[in-house]
């Protein structure tokens, strides 16, 4: 009787969490994990020096030097000092505090921590779907899609960069959508906080506040908000985002505003590597335009791919029709979205489209499949669930 009263969602996520606890130690060490561990202690000793925790700083310095002496071929953290603060530094702190001295143990702890972040993001993705769609069955299907995509599921136990960014981005979008629903200060602060963490993890996280500002500007153009509300929202978002970024991201402490463009150059550094793709070798900066679409299409289940294509076409059709019907000086039905749900759909559509165009046409350096664009997984599954929702609505309408 008691079990029947427990929400199925609790059982679902408890089972998933227990599964993660059972298998997280089965995964090996990723090619970049040694450097990421080094990077964590690099930032940790900087922070401890600033806070004047001399005893802990001495231990962190010992760890850092031990890593450098064990593998001198690792890249220099002084050069690659523009990411790693959000995941690697807390992981290094845990290793230091709990005195994890065995290599097997501290890498397994990192894997468990990585799984924990993804697990939390899965809960937030479930909540995103729950606030958007009303049919429970497709909400659970969407959550299963999000968790069980083979490539994402496997990497969620060891990929401390790309899956971590996906996780933070998902949490950030949850608060962004809450802001779409209610323009509360709390939603702005939480969105900006997680957007800042996403940005310090991958520079592509910067798109989140930028796209939100564009949506607010569209609201203003369509006369949904007054000029004073427009300026207030813009100011609050910029203030809390920059503040959150500055408080936790030492890389920008040395930022010279007049050299802002050069500050971005480090993020576009790429190694001089060639990869095999369809029988030919290509430089990672000059890949065929089909590289990303091919890797996405062959590594996600075919049913998700089909749902994505159908949903993408339908959303595009709706946006095209709305845009074509916009008339000056006409207020009724003269906008790109007519509800908060449509606004959410448009945000996801624009996000996926923008990054696909960016990756395909602007010679983005990629390797190891599409791992640098794992964050698209959020948008892909959302649109797939959107299609499932339309299918259910169609059959319900037909039945009636």
Please identify what each model-predicted range represents.
Residues 22, 142, 175, 187-202, ...:
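Membrane-interface alpha helices of multi-pass inner-membrane proteins
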Residues 108, 112-133, 171, 175, ...:
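Transmembrane-helix motifs of polytopic, lipid-linked glycan transferases
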Residues 133, 172-188, 198, 222:
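Membrane-interface transmembrane helices that cradle and orient dolichyl/undecaprenyl
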Residues 31, 110-120, 140-148, 152-171, ...:
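Multi-pass, polyprenyl lipid-linked donor-dependent membrane glycosyltransferases
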Residues 162-166, 198-201, 207, 298-302, ...:
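Hydrophobic/aromatic-rich transmembrane helices and adjacent perimembrane loops
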Residues 7-14, 120, 125-148, 181, ...:
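Transmembrane-helix signature of polytopic, membrane-embedded enzymes
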